C-alpha cells in the first residue's frame, strides 16, 4: 500500500484521547449548561462525523452520525479558522442593519469576520430551526493551520454565554487541539516506523 496509504490508515485509527473525552463529557457541558455538546471530526474530503457527545437524558443520541461536507460551506470553514468561538444566543433574533452598508473611505463592505455580534447566514439559521435548536456555541479545533473539527453545543431554548465562559471554552479548545496534534503526530511516526521496518 505504500507509506501514504499506511498513513491514511493510521489517521483513521487515531482516537480522541481520554482527556478530550473529559472536556466534552464533563467540563464543557457542565461548565456551559448546553443541552448537547458534540465533537465533530472532518475527514480529508471535508465530511464530518460526531465521535464524542454529552447530552441531556431526554435527547436522542447523535453519536456516530455522519454529515456531508456541503453542510459547512468553504466560506464558513474559513471563518471558523479566523474567529474560533461563535455563540448564537437565540436563533429567532432580529438582525440589526449595518449603517452604512459600505465603508465610506473605500466603498468596500466592512470585514465583520472577527466580530462576535456578526449575523449568521440565513441558511444556517434555517438549518438550526429545522433541527429545533435555539442556541449554539461552536469552538474550532485547529491542527497545523487547518480545521480539524469542531466542538458544537446545542440548546433547545435561548442561551446566553458570558464573555468569561467564552474565553474558557476558547482555552479548552486550544488545549484539545494541542492534544490532537500530539496524538496524530505520534501515530504518524509509528506508522512511518512500521513501514520503514517492513521495507528493510
Regions found by a protein language model. Give the residues of each.
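Signal-transducing coupling segments at domain and membrane junctions
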Residues: 94-134
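Short hydrophobic/glycine-rich mini-motifs in sensory/regulatory modules
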Residues: 1, 47, 141-151
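Short hydrophobic beta-strand micro-motif common in sensory/regulatory domains
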Residues: 134-142
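Regulatory loop-to-helix N-cap segments in sensory/regulatory domains
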Residues: 115-120, 148, 154-170, 180-186
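GAF sensory/regulatory domain recognition
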Residues: 40-102, 197
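Signal-transducing coiled-coil/dimerization helices and immediately adjacent hinge/linker segments
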Residues: 14-33, 182-200
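Short, glycine/acidic-rich hinge or "gate" loops at secondary-structure transitions
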Residues: 40-46, 145, 185-195
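Short regulatory alpha-helical segment in sensory/regulatory domains of signaling proteins that mediates
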Residues: 24-33, 38-43, 52-55, 128-129
Amino acid at each position: 500500500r505504500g507509506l501514504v496509504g499506511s498513513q491514511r490508515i493510521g489517521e483513521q485509527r487515531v482516537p480522541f484521547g481520554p482527556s478530550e473525552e473529559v472536556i466534552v463529557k464533563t467540563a464543557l457541558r457542565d461548565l456551559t449548561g448546553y443541552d448537547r455538546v458534540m465533537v465533530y471530526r472532518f475527514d480529508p474530503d471535508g465530511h464530518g462525523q460526531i465521535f464524542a457527545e454529552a447530552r441531556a437524558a431526554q435527547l436522542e443520541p447523535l453519536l456516530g452520525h455522519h454529515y456531508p461536507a456541503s453542510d459547512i460551506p468553504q466560506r464558513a470553514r474559513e471563518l471558523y479558522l479566523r474567529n474560533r468561538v461563535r455563540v448564537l444566543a437565540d436563533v429567532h433574533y432580529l438582525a440589526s442593519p449595518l449603517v452604512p452598508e459600505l465603508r465610506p473611505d473605500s466603498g468596500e463592505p466592512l470585514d465583520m469576520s472577527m466580530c462576535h455580534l456578526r449575523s449568521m447566514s440565513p441558511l444556517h439559521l434555517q438549518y438550526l430551526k429545522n433541527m429545533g435548536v435555539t442556541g449554539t456555541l461552536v469552538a474550532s479545533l485547529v491542527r497545523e493551520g487547518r480545521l480539524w473539527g469542531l466542538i458544537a453545543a446545542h440548546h433547545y431554548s435561548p442561551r446566553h454565554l458570558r464573555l468569561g465562559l467564552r474565553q474558557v471554552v476558547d482555552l479548552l479548545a486550544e488545549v484539545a487541539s494541542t492534544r490532537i496534534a500530539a496524538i496524530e503526530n505520534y501515530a504518524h511516526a509509528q506508522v512511518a516506523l512500521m513501514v520503514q521496518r517492513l521495507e528493510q
